Amino acid sequence: MAATFFGEVVKAPCRAGTEDEEEEDEGRRETPEDREVRQQLARKREVRLLRRQTKTSLEVSLLEKYPCSKFIIAIGNNAVAFLSSFVMNSGVWEEVGCAKLWNEWCRTTDTIHLSSTEAFCVFYHLKSNPSVFLCQCSCYVAEDQQYQWLEKVFGSCPRKNMQITILTCRHVTDYKTSESTGSLPSPFLKALKTQNFKDPACCPLLEQPNIVHDLPAAVLSYCQVWKIPAILYLCYTDVMKLDLITVEAFKPLLSTRSLKGLVKNIPQSTEILKKLMTTNEIQSNIYT
């Protein structure tokens, strides 16, 4: 095989190597038992949306069933804690579904009776304005499950007249900069938005060559493809567990159009957040 550009290293074909590979391929041929195991695992890893009240699956995607104008998605413990304290306590929210999934990092099997310490992915809408949706997702959605999650939530042909806001965290060591990460004022916010998102961001935009990962990246890419206005707020922090300072780093979002009308009493919400942190510390303490 010829090189396609100067300096490219190419391997010459080797008959012996080809024969070895053919023997390995024969040894790797799938048996009926292997196929059955693979199919069982695939079924186990299917993402399902359920109504916990009725214990039934949603037959259509969430946003096909319910009209949506605004959708706020919190991914990870600190983002979830921010929405719980500042948004969910400022209005009456009704649960409309929850995601049931199983993978290497998320093994919650009983979605009907979730404890406060379990990983979860729950969807709500605002009773006074049912087109406003909120998702609290503290569980890990594996790479092979992300497309399923998007289909179950948005559907195969999503509406474009809605606005998506995503909140999540990454460790500060993932942030690429010419400076030392030790000198950065952690935690700090960066934003990344789709081409159709026209509102100003409440923090600086994420610079190249930084990238986003996992479910937040999948949601943002989906919105870019479908021309849905969406913005991701990414908090870089040196504390990935539930942390008061990291949660409060999301406070600039309270002035954005997405959240401005949803938060009524910031001092009261701050007190609720502190109580939430205290409860979490007590539950995490092995000596209590």
Swiss-Prot record:
Q: What does this protein do?
A: Chaperone protein which promotes assembly of the 20S proteasome as part of a heterodimer with PSMG2. The PSMG1-PSMG2 heterodimer binds to the PSMA5 and PSMA7 proteasome subunits, promotes assembly of the proteasome alpha subunits into the heteroheptameric alpha ring and prevents alpha ring dimerization.
Locate the Phosphoserine modifications and list their residues: 180
Q: Where is the composition biased (Basic and acidic residues)?
A: 26-37
The record lists the membrane-crossing segments as none
Q: Its GO biological process terms?
A: cerebellar granule cell precursor proliferation; chaperone-mediated protein complex assembly; proteasome core complex assembly
Quaternary state and partners of this protein?
Answer: Forms a heterodimer with PSMG2. The PSMG1-PSMG2 heterodimer interacts directly with the PSMA5 and PSMA7 proteasome alpha subunits.
UniProt-recorded name of the protein: Proteasome assembly chaperone 1
Protein source organism:
Callithrix jacchus (White-tufted-ear marmoset)
Gene Ontology molecular functions:
molecular adaptor activity; proteasome binding
Q: Record's family?
A: Belongs to the PSMG1 family.
Would you tell me the Gene Ontology cellular component terms?
cytosol; endoplasmic reticulum; Golgi apparatus; nucleoplasm; protein folding chaperone complex
| Superkingdom field | Eukaryota
Modification after translation (UniProt): Degraded by the proteasome upon completion of 20S proteasome maturation.
- Region Disordered, annotated ranges: 1-37
